[in-house]
């Protein structure tokens, strides 16, 4: 029997674009859940299988999901209501939805949580731009979609992509604030904090400036480690989160990041996401590229920096057919952001297939 093409060629995935709206958080969640019910249930079940393969029992991942959802309710009741609506609309209980929404936090229960994303940015007045690869299991290559979210009163419309069941992930809002995500790892990581994907959703919906986004991130009691890169037309700020502590990285011109801590003040307890991580090799590849690169004329100029030769298993990553299908990692999407031009482009697969 032939394998589904996405297991070896994620760029061939037909990505759905959906418009999500509702009169309140819960109603918007219900609308999302009903519209995408089958895919939301499939994604939740896929994460349950992943956790089982990693040795996380059903009771443990459910307890972790509930703890993270409780933290989300304390931090932002509206987002908790939206998550409850998504679950109801999709025919899941809330803890089952939490296996997706809090999957980053749940994976802190294993010694080698995978995720190998690479981000490149350029800061200049009126023309800051950013791009990233999103690397994940090839088995989840069909578990994400583009979206356009209609704002509630006091919110901003936003566009980008998310996984089925999450209200937000990576994107750009109508105020010109964008956000990227890279996973980091620290010895104190654990489940139970606000899910980082809930934080991303709030930034996209509510942040009117880069400074507001940074303060939202710093206000969230997260228990896992991540890099959240906030992009506006005039500035780029990378926020490293180490299980509750934060550090900011910012400078004019080029700034790149992969999956290990760069801030000196967060080195105590810093770890690789996986002993086999390529984070240092990918950072070196990006730094070599920006070393001779002129200021970008547009976000398309960032794409070549991400286009490492696929056979190198570096920034641009194809599934390894020699590995078991469920273990294959790959670049599932490439994201380009240009806040000044109100542009966010999300394309499936390695950056070689991204629009210039």
Protein language model features and the residues they cover:
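C-terminus-biased signal that marks the final domain/tail of proteins
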Residues: 1-116, 206-227, 232-238, 242-243, ...
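Short, well-ordered beta-strand elements within core beta-sheets of diverse protein domains
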Residues: 201-205
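Acidic, Ser/Thr-rich peripheral helices and adjacent loops at domain boundaries
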Residues: 246-253
């Amino acid at each position: 029997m032939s394998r589904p093409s996405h297991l070896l060629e994620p760029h061939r995935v037909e990505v759905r674009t959906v418009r999500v709206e509702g009169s309140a958080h819960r109603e918007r969640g219900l609308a999302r859940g009903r519209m995408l019910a089958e895919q939301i249930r499939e994604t939740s079940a896929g994460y349950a299988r992943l956790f089982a393969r990693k040795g996380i029992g059903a009771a443990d991942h459910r307890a972790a999901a509930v703890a993270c959802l409780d933290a989300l309710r304390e931090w932002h009741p509206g987002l908790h209501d939206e998550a409850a609506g998504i679950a109801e609309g999709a025919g899941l209980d809330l803890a089952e939805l939490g296996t997706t929404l809090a999957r980053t936090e749940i994976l802190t229960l294993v010694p080698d949580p995978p995720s190998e994303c690479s981000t490149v940015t350029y800061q200049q007045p009126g023309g800051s731009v950013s791009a990233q690869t999103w690397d994940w299991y090839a088995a989840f290559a069909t578990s994400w979609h583009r979206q356009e979210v209609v704002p509630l009163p006091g919110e901003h419309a936003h566009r980008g992509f998310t996984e089925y069941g999450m209200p937000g992930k990576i994107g750009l809002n109508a105020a010109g604030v964008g956000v990227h995500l890279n996973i980091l790892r620290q010895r104190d990581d654990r489940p139970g904090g606000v899910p980082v994907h809930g934080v991303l959703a709030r930034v996209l919906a509510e942040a009117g400036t880069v400074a507001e986004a940074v303060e939202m991130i710093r206000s969230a009691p997260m228990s896992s480690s991540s890099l959240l890169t906030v992009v506006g037309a005039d500035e780029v700020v990378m926020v490293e989160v180490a299980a509750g502590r934060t550090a900011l990285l910012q400078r004019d011109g080029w700034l790149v990041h992969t999956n290990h801590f760069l801030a000196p003040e967060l080195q105590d307890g810093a770890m690789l996401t996986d002993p086999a991580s390529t984070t240092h090799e990918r950072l070196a590849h990006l730094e070599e590229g920006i070393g001779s690169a002129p200021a970008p004329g547009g976000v398309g100029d960032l794409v070549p920096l991400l286009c490492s030769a696929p056979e190198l298993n570096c920034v641009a990553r194809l599934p390894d057919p020699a590995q078991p299908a469920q273990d294959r990692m790959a670049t599932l999407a490439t994201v380009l952001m240009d806040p000044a031009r109100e542009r966010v482009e999300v394309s499936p697969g390695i950056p070689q297939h991204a629009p210039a």
